Amino acid sequence: MRVGVLGARGKVGATMVAGVEAADDLTFTTGVDAGDSLSALVDSDTEVVIDFTHPSVVMDNLKFLIDNGIHAVVGTTGFTDERLDQVREWLAATPGASVLIAPNFAIGAVLSMHFAQQAAKYFESVEVIELHHPHKADAPSGTAMRTARLIAEARKGMPPNPDATSTGLDGARGADVDGVPVHSVRLAGLVAHQEVLFGTMGETLTIRHDSIDRTSFVPGVLLAVRKIRERPGLTIGIEPLLDLK
């Protein structure tokens, strides 16, 4: 399979290039960065593109890829419901290309979200803390947003988090994502980390995942690259590829 990388000179993108080049069943075709022409992907007969760019350009990238029948595996964050609906419209109008967008490709991070969803209904309190390097463009992270939404879905019908806070500084209790408080930390020296804290009478449970190196994303990305042609249209997350129950 012929694979290109958008954002190839970025820290994550360069890691993806190395991962593709190390895979016996994949061929790296070309890397494209800011200022480069996307047509290089067509000229090199690229079949699948890995996109780790920026929220400000990812939609234009996807429109080009879909229009040219190139599959896309996207790790760029900043996808709102409106953006996802737009991608679905493009895919419906141009059958033949598939897109997989995941808030996190680290297998451990995906499993931690799955575990959090399973635990959610057993605890009366839950909060999410995500910690990243200071160059990250969005807050909260896509992983934290998805985690909170999965938890909220699992807690449907349950009372809201107990919280007697009546005064305080704006933002002190974090962002509210479907009723789940989410707190963002940006700190030099970090890569990508998340804690989900659960509490109930007499006990707490913490589910934590740490990506200490960007190579943690490679196995999940390459799994998506190998499976993308089997999943027409838009796929969110790599959970469907992991056979999680």
Swiss-Prot record:
Transmembrane parts of this sequence: none
GO cellular component: cytosol
Keyword Oxidoreductase: yes
Keyword Cytoplasm on entry: yes
E.C. code: 1.17.1.8
Residues that bind NAD(+): G7, A8, R9, G10, K11, V12, G75, T76, T77, A102, P103, N104, F105
Catalytic activity entry: (S)-2,3,4,5-tetrahydrodipicolinate + NAD(+) + H2O = (2S,4S)-4-hydroxy-2,3,4,5-tetrahydrodipicolinate + NADH + H(+); (S)-2,3,4,5-tetrahydrodipicolinate + NADP(+) + H2O = (2S,4S)-4-hydroxy-2,3,4,5-tetrahydrodipicolinate + NADPH + H(+)
Classification via PROSITE patterns: DAPB
Disulfide bond sites: none
Superkingdom as given in the UniProt entry: Bacteria
Enzyme class: oxidoreductase
Active site: H132, K136
GO molecular function, one term: 4-hydroxy-tetrahydrodipicolinate reductase
Pfam families, A to Z: DapB_C, DapB_N
InterPro entries on file: DapB_C, DapB_N, DapB_N_CS, DHDPR_bac, NAD(P)-bd_dom_sf
Annotated family: Belongs to the DapB family.
Function of the molecule: Catalyzes the conversion of 4-hydroxy-tetrahydrodipicolinate (HTPA) to tetrahydrodipicolinate.
PANTHER family, per the entry: 4-HYDROXY-TETRAHYDRODIPICOLINATE REDUCTASE 1, CHLOROPLASTIC-RELATED (PTHR20836:SF0), DIHYDRODIPICOLINATE REDUCTASE (PTHR20836)
Protein name: 4-hydroxy-tetrahydrodipicolinate reductase
Species whose genome carries this gene: Mycolicibacterium vanbaalenii (strain DSM 7251 / JCM 13017 / BCRC 16820 / KCTC 9966 / NRRL B-24157 / PYR-1) (Mycobacterium vanbaalenii)
Upper lineage: Bacteria, Bacillati, Actinomycetota, Actinomycetes, Mycobacteriales
Gene: dapB
